[in-house]
Amino acid sequence: MEQKRGMRKTRVGVVVSDKMDKTVVVAVERHVQHPLYKKTIKRTTKFKAHDENNECRVGDKVLIMETRPLSKEKRWRVVQILERAK
């Protein structure tokens, strides 16, 4: 019996650290509205993502996708490098 896998979450972010082996830290920015003042504020979340070939560098814009837990904190993997750092 085949099971269909649900749609996995994807995010676009910027690599802020590539110091680890096969892992990068990706900062994903989102905009939320302040509950009282209704001003739109930027909020940043950092995700640890699997980078199999150590291709990503700091400043690269990447697409990450949710995956099974790979370690204690790593649940995302780099799918594609959208834009290289200058």
Curated annotation (Swiss-Prot):
Keyword Ribosomal protein: yes
UniProt KW keywords: Ribonucleoprotein, Ribosomal protein, RNA-binding, rRNA-binding
A GO term for molecular function: structural constituent of ribosome
GO cellular component terms, A-Z: cytosolic small ribosomal subunit
CDD domains: Ribosomal_uS17 (cd00364)
Gene Ontology biological-process entries: translation
Signal peptide: none
Domain of life of the organism encoding this protein: Bacteria
Any Pfam family hit: Ribosomal_S17
Keyword Metal-binding included in the entry's annotation: no
Subunit structure: Part of the 30S ribosomal subunit.
NCBIfam families the UniProt entry points to: PRK05610.1, uS17_bact
Protein task: One of the primary rRNA binding proteins, it binds specifically to the 5'-end of 16S ribosomal RNA.
PANTHER family registered for this protein in UniProt: 40S RIBOSOMAL PROTEIN S11 FAMILY MEMBER, SMALL RIBOSOMAL SUBUNIT PROTEIN US17M
UniProt similarity note: Belongs to the universal ribosomal protein uS17 family.
UniProt name for this protein: Small ribosomal subunit protein uS17
Organism: Caldicellulosiruptor bescii (strain ATCC BAA-1888 / DSM 6725 / KCTC 15123 / Z-1320) (Anaerocellum thermophilum)
Lineage: Bacteria, Bacillati, Bacillota, Bacillota incertae sedis, Caldicellulosiruptorales
Gene: rpsQ
